[in-house]
Amino acid sequence: NTSMLIADIVGITGSFSTAYGAHTGIATLPLKYYGNKDQKEKYLNGLVSGELKGAYCLTEPDSGSDANSGKSRAILSEDKSKYIINGQKMWISNGGFADLFIVFAKIDNDKNLTAFIVEKGLDGINMNPEEDKLGIKGSSTRQIFFNDVEIPSTNILGNREEGFKIALNVLNIGRIKLGAGVLGGCRGVIDHSINYSKERIQFNLPIASFGAIKYKLSNMIVKTFSCESICYRAGDDIEQKIKEFQADGKNLNESELTAIELFSVECAICKIYGSEILDYVVDEGVQIYGGMGYSEEAPMARPYRDARISRIYEGTNEINRMLIVGTLLKKSMKNEINLFKKAMEVIKDGKLKKIHYSSDNHFKSSYDLVNSLKDCFLYIFGKAAMHFNDKIKSEQEVMMNIADVIISIYVLESTLKRCEKIYLNNKNKIMIEISKASIYSNISIIRHHSIESVISYMDNNDAKKSIDFINSCTEFENFNIKEVNRNIANYFLEKKSYSLFNNFK
């Protein structure tokens, strides 16, 4: 949670956030978790103090999302004293100033990658000039070439062919931190947008008084609030699980890695949702600024450019969507979770849902809705698994639809939990409004992707029955969303800010 909070705070800096995140995350954590005693003594203290700067060398020209297909090779010398590395890495953050590289390559004809610790000053390391990027221009991004680079055989990190596992485990951490890392940028754009909309006069009125602008501000705020909710919920769940594992006798490193792997789906959700709401927020920020938003003189251009990379690094959002559903399928087949059994129960029952809303018990009614939405997920998940069997992984459109349903349910439930907690603490009615806005938007997403999923492979009669069930699961109270959005916008326009430490009093 500490590292997530720091990522949250520095996220507004864009380029510095990228450099900081690459160094403290993917460049340092492999050594923390997989380095031996000698490696940690030699390198880890310097990385932690900042005396050494690190970079992570995984991506290659022909291996991006398919990271384990990398062509870089390491050959053990005849006397077994050193490895000789050859290969090319690209899009390496911090490449221009890093002192230490975590390099992934295959030994001989191994199937899987191995990780190596490589010092920058060695002969045979060459770099291209800095990449001319769309955004995060203040960060260093280089191509790095390794030509017969000799490293001591003691600089193998972890075990042979363990590199892909190291890469995945470290990326899980990077994903949840990226979710938190977008928040500072979102808040900064929201604050600029609030203040500009109050100052900008058109038709003799501040544009903040217009419904179209209030709609934008409300959605920017609610989505950011929801992103905070999922990140700190997932972070706390991981922290609690780490403590449980430690109480059972596992050491800290083992406890952290096991807990993070257990919550890999939540890490992917945070990454996907965070990066996409950042794009949404900065885009609406430019729109609120109008023509000025398109100028480099205004505070919108840089966030707009910087935001785009977040949907690509730490695994593209498409790959992460596949990971969410693929992980659940894998765990279900191993009987680690009983999703298949629950899905079959929902499908067999097949009764249409009817959720009764009570304004006197808003949150209880809302949780009843969440349970109904979970049945909707189980239904489409089970139907797809039954239809495609082991071929479902080739049906990426269906998997992405299912992933979007999962994401929206997690986002909505997390938002409701946080709204309820704050509301019970101080009875601030804005929490009711935020929860209503989240319900409205997430129901629409869930209904859309659920229907799109089933009609992509069902015949007309089966599709109609499924759509009836989906509609019953997603039918809820018709809130006056116009007034809800206006109330939310007015609340924060009066405050003149959306702050991380806002106590909502």
Model-found features: residue ranges?
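Active-site beta-strand/loop segments that form the cofactor-binding cradle
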Residues: N1-Y20, K32, S49, C57-D62, ...
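Charged, glycine-rich active-site and insertion segments that engage polyanionic ligands
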Residues: A259-M292, I432-S450
